[in-house]
Amino acid sequence: MKVSLMAAKAKNGVIGCGPHIPWSAKGEQLLFKALTYNQWLLVGRKTFESMGALPNRKYAVVTRSAWTADNDNVIVFPSIEEAMYGLAELTDHVIVSGGGEIYRETLPMASTLHISTIDIEPEGDVFFPNIPNTFEVVFEQHFSSNINYCYQIWQKG
């Protein structure tokens, strides 16, 4: 199963401040919506609760709590390992979509990274992990918006 990570991060690596994204770059979330349409997303519970279930997507939510979802498009798993095992039976591609701990644990499994770097350095308490030098940028596009950003695709070498 192919594992991709998709994230928007600030220049200082911040991806969140509590349950919130500390910016709103017009147009950037359209990339997320387009690339995740009809895909399986792997997220942590806090990320899922903050973003909610977008239509036409299926979710594998990882949580250590007794949390359950009242949604046919959501499957809850107690660990990333169990989620990956279960997803391998359901799909050939999963997009990891946060939060910070989930990104850190799945980065070694990923072959592709979809990263939007937002031209801002906000305060925050959740960070995207450093990208290992085993990845290289294979595509890059800059966008002018209310807050400029750069979308990159990284491939593992």
UniProtKB/Swiss-Prot annotation:
Limits of the DHFR domain: 2-156
E.C. code: 1.5.1.3
Determine if rRNA processing is one of this entry's keywords.
no
Q: CDD domains given for it? A: DHFR
- Which reaction(s) does the protein catalyse, per the Swiss-Prot or TrEMBL entry? (6S)-5,6,7,8-tetrahydrofolate + NADP(+) = 7,8-dihydrofolate + NADPH + H(+)
**SUPFAM superfamilies documented for this protein:** Dihydrofolate reductase-like (SSF53597)
Molecular function per GO: dihydrofolate reductase activity; NADP binding
* Enzyme class of the recorded protein, top EC level: oxidoreductase
Q: Which residues form a coiled coil?
A: none
Q: In which pathway does it act?
A: Cofactor biosynthesis; tetrahydrofolate biosynthesis; 5,6,7,8-tetrahydrofolate from 7,8-dihydrofolate: step 1/1
State the GO CC annotations. Answer: cytosol
**Cross-referenced Pfam families, in alphabetical order?**
DHFR_1 (PF00186)
Q: Which UniProt keywords apply?
A: Antibiotic resistance, Methotrexate resistance, NADP, One-carbon metabolism, Oxidoreductase, Plasmid, Trimethoprim resistance
Misc remark for this entry?
Confers trimethoprim resistance.
Summarize subunit and interaction data from the UniProt record for this chain.
Answer: Homodimer.
Function summary: Key enzyme in folate metabolism. Catalyzes an essential reaction for de novo glycine and purine synthesis, and for DNA precursor synthesis.
Please give the family membership noted in the entry. Answer: Belongs to the dihydrofolate reductase family.
Name of the protein this chain belongs to? Dihydrofolate reductase type 5
User: Which organism encodes this protein?
Assistant: Escherichia coli
> Top-down, what is the taxonomic lineage of the species of origin?
Bacteria, Pseudomonadati, Pseudomonadota, Gammaproteobacteria, Enterobacterales
Q: Give the gene symbol.
A: dhfrV
